[in-house]
Amino acid sequence: MKNILVGVTGGIAAYKSASIVSLLKKKGYNVKVVMTENATKIIGPLTLETLSRNRIYVDMWDTNPHYEVEHISLADWADIVLIAPATYDIIGKVANGIADDMLTTILSAVSVRKPVFFALAMNVNMYENPILKENITKLKSYGYKFIEAEEGLLACNYVAKGRMSEPENIVEEIERYNIYSKIKNSDTVLKGKKILITSGRTKENIDPIRYLSNNSSGKMGYSLAQAAVDLGAKVTLISGPTNLEAPRGLENFVSVESALEMYDKVDSFFKDTDIFIACAAVADYRPKEYKKEKIKKSDSDLLIELVRNPDILAEMGKKKDKQLLLGFAAETNNIKENALKKLEKKNLDIIVANNASTMGRDSNTIEIIKKDKTSIEINQKNKIELAYNILLEVISVLKKDKNEKE
């Protein structure tokens, strides 16, 4: 699905459409933009024309020479339609079959088999209006998809829900759908499975202002959690500190800080888990003693005695009964060799090997290795794509185990 039609309406968030179009182009999508007349008063068509590298469509009665019925040809051309911002007005029109300008006429002609996303944006009172809620419910029943608004400072100076989701989040939603749509009908193996995932980094406090930690962003674990939810799993995410929003649709979201806290939470959920994915970057060591007051600087060296933290994945490997265990090996050298050692030592079913230098980045190259020593290498994919590829390997292991038992 590489052709995206972006509809820009007259909400103040229309200025963000420039970033959305730019991000989509960087992802390799073909982008065409349709604007309402009101949208052109907020952001100039030339800006979006330059970013999309395509003509902008506004007027049904454009006098430029063309030989197509454009509202039909554009509806046919698009693989995905994204309305951003999606205002109270556009939702009401589409829900009630009104087609009185170029954008709404195109939307009336888009096949029901094509995904149409609305990125909601409006004043909080409009957002909570029962008429809007009824229209959204109606459109959802027809298969339309909605990207919820976020809380924040609105144009009307309210601080409330109604602000359009950030362009990065909107594009990520499109990316996730695009990948998910390729596999959603092929497998239902994960539907109803209880999946426990750890993500993020841990913090080991030295004193009130200092701690030991690492550079993990948590993006891989959060992407896995969202992908698993999308594939029908019941997901519990145990997360160390990150700057990320919790994925939607989780059964449980548990925040922790230290390795010991993470161990205790994993242990409490593990018994009833079908699949455990250990994606967190857990500190191997912690200070033996926590100083309640700030350690003062002195002229001499400072020695901090460290003690081992429990190896969460290894401990769960010992307790493993019916669970499938998947771990990660972030290495700086002998990557596959070290990953294979961890696979065997920790009693894992799958291990994902990668170079530790890529920690925190949006894309990565990984090698997925299974306990039968078969492996697959995936080069330079974003973490959403990697998440689905990892889960496809989990599905293949579950299928194989089921066939062997039968």
Residue ranges and their predicted role:
Residues 1-118, 123-406:
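A cross-family phosphate/adenosyl-ligand binding-site feature
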